[in-house]
A protein has these predicted regions:
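Short, hydrophobic-biased segments on the C-terminal half of alpha helices
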Residues: 43-44
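Alpha-helical residues within the helix-turn-helix
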Residues: 30, 47-48
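Beta-hairpin "wing" of winged helix-turn-helix
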Residues: 50-64
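Short amphipathic alpha-helical interface segments
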Residues: 10-19
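C-terminal regulatory/oligomerization modules of transcriptional regulators
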Residues: 72, 86, 91-141
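A short alpha-helical element within helix-turn-helix/winged-helix DNA-binding domains
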Residues: 26-32
Length: 141
């Protein structure tokens, strides 16, 4: 599991809870069985990237910094992993992989990569959270 996966899970958790009530990071860590200090570092990055707000004090915690309809998967992934490189990386690791000089998988990988980017920039957090809730209900009967 990578850091951006955990960030997405934590953001879904925040989208599922009351937006005006801060949630303790320990609670999210316990819910997903993530080491607290590891999640705290991830959340610190999300605060710096202005995706969540940290509230200090006895009733403090973290909450979404903006409407979950305006947060997309790519916002979360890029906040944690950084922006994708300007020059596309080859799926098989070759130095040169372009339409003019393709690797053996270039033609198959290019549409998948495009579709993945499209999905990540069009799937808002609120829809993702609703779908996760539905799936949990189906799984739990």
């Amino acid at each position: 599991v990578c850091s951006s996966d955990l960030a997405i899970q934590a953001m879904i958790y925040l989208a599922e809870t009351k937006p005006e009530k801060p949630v303790m990071i320990r609670k999210i860590a316990a819910e997903y069985n993530i080491p607290y200090h590891f999640l705290a570092k991830i959340m610190q990055t999300l605060v710096k990237q202005r995706l969540i707000k940290a509230v200090r004090g006895r009733t403090g915690g973290v909450l979404l910094a903006k409407d979950p309809k305006k947060i997309f998967l790519n916002d979360i992934v890029y906040a944690i992993d950084g922006l994708p490189p300007e020059k596309e990386q080859c799926i098989v690791g070759l130095d040169l992989c372009t339409d003019d000089a393709p690797c053996p998988l270039h033609d198959q990988w290019k549409p998948i990569r495009s579709k993945l980017r499209e999905l990540m920039s069009s799937e808002p957090l609120d829809v993702l959270a609703k779908n996760v809730i539905k799936k949990r209900k189906l799984m739990n009967g």
